[in-house]
From Swiss-Prot:
Binds 1 Mg(2+) ion per subunit. The active site is at H329 (proton acceptor). The keyword Lyase applies. This is L-rhamnonate dehydratase.
Length: 405
């Protein structure tokens, strides 16, 4: 009889943070909104706060970067470690060190689903429908997958059953789709800059932006709009029709997450052939089931916010059962290892984090070492063949561990 590998137990979990309101600004990392000055990601982008003039020019003005990066590390009894990053900062550290640790330490490194279920159920009374708590649980879950892969010597995508394609092809999110085309991406997604409080003039301005970019990029390059929860159904419908002559591929996250009836109506009224997408800020499996029932075309969970890889796999199954695509919100290696195993993810998102979108920069720079970026708009599966998620933690970053246990 062949020997069966004896897996170690988890000895300790630790949590650090960097950036956010209580540390240095512009740290980047897991909180990719935490960028320095003159960055496209903070340049007059439409948000739910844009209706207040004091907060319409900059997303950082209303505090989009106050959380900072959470780093969770899990250590096995044999000394091997796994880690992950997300957006939860110092508050996430408290949740990990003072609550979730009891469900992690002492478990076998393969007990990922058990730990995940216990974390979800133990936080129901204060987690609501996602948010900070789910970001934290996601980070723990990803760290556990990283550790498991390193212990058994396999990349995470092979733990999920293996690749269904040889490479991942990407579209780029940023202010310059024309530059993205030159870099080999299949499409470009731009943020909208105006909302319902701007009236029809706002629609005309954003439609003109799409028209200008269509002229620069040509007919065969995808163009999309990211509306970041900033619109209502009427405005979104009018904007979609205003952009239809320029072959807009999809219109994304027009409405706040819980407006399911609004998404159903928007899908009914959108121009024929234009897709409606959402999911970045949905935070539970149940919310994605309801979102799927609206009939939208693509669900876009963030693996660092929706419950981790364990939940992302379940979301992909929901989407597949309805013939929908699941294209995760850009989350680098954490989604790469998942989507290369999903048959309903024919492409993926790469978030441009260079200030003017003119260069390729790893999304979670500088917190991850050896983080891959697309080459000619693609990443081959061989790039993902290192154990775990294949990246290392940059311990030269200003990491703080505010709590212990």
């Amino acid at each position: 009889m062949e020997n069966i590998m004896t897996l170690p137990k988890i000895k300790q979990v630790r949590a650090w943070f960097t950036g956010g309101a209580t540390a240095e600004k512009g740290a980047g990392g897991g909180d990719y909104h935490d960028q320095g000055a003159n960055h496209w990601i903070d340049d007059h982008i439409a948000t739910p706060m844009s209706k207040y003039r004091d907060y319409e020019q900059s997303r950082q003005s209303f505090g989009i970067n106050v959380l900072g990066t959470l780093v969770v590390e899990v250590e096995a009894e044999n000394g091997q470690t796994g880690f992950a990053v997300s957006t939860a900062g110092e508050m996430g550290c408290f949740i990990v060190e003072k609550h979730l640790n009891r469900f992690i330490e002492g478990k076998c490194v393969s007990d990922i689903k058990l730990i995940h279920d216990q974390m979800l159920n133990a936080t129901l009374y204060y987690s609501g429908s996602g948010g900070l708590v789910m970001n934290t649980i996601s980070c723990v879950d990803l760290a556990l997958w990283d550790l498991f892969g390193k212990v058994v010597g396999l990349p995470v995508y092979k733990l999920l059953g293996g690749a269904v394609r040889d490479e991942i092809q990407f579209y780029a999110t940023g202010a310059r789709p024309d530059l993205a085309k030159e870099m080999g991406f299949i499409g470009g997604k731009m943020p909208t800059h105006w909302g319902p409080h701007d009236g029809d003039a706002g629609i005309r301005k954003d439609a003109a932006m799409v028209a200008d970019m269509r002229e620069k990029c040509g007919e065969d390059f995808w163009l999309m709009l990211d509306c970041w929860m900033s619109q209502d159904v009427n405005y979104a419908t009018k904007l979609a029709h205003a952009c239809a002559p320029y072959n807009l591929k999809w219109i994304e996250e027009c409405l706040p997450p819980q407006q399911y009836e609004g998404y159903r109506e928007l899908k009914r009224n959108a121009p024929v052939g234009m897709m409606v997408t959402s999911g970045e800020h949905h935070g539970t499996l149940q919310s994605f089931r309801t979102l799927s029932e609206t009939g939208i075309d693509i669900m876009q969970p963030d693996v660092g916010w929706c419950g981790g890889l364990t939940t992302l796999v379940e979301i992909a199954a929901i989407a597949k059962s309805r013939g929908q695509l699941v294209v995760p919100h850009g989350s680098s290696v954490y989604s790469h290892h998942a989507v290369i195993t999903f048959t309903n993810t024919p492409f993926s998102e790469f978030l441009m984090t260079s200030p003017d979108c003119s260069t390729m920069r790893p999304q979670f720079d500088p917190i991850l070492l050896n983080e891959p970026v697309p080459v000619n708009g693609r990443i081959h599966k061989s790039v993902l063949d290192k154990p775990g998620f294949g990246v290392e933690l940059n311990r030269d970053c200003n990491l703080k561990r505010p709590y212990s246990h």
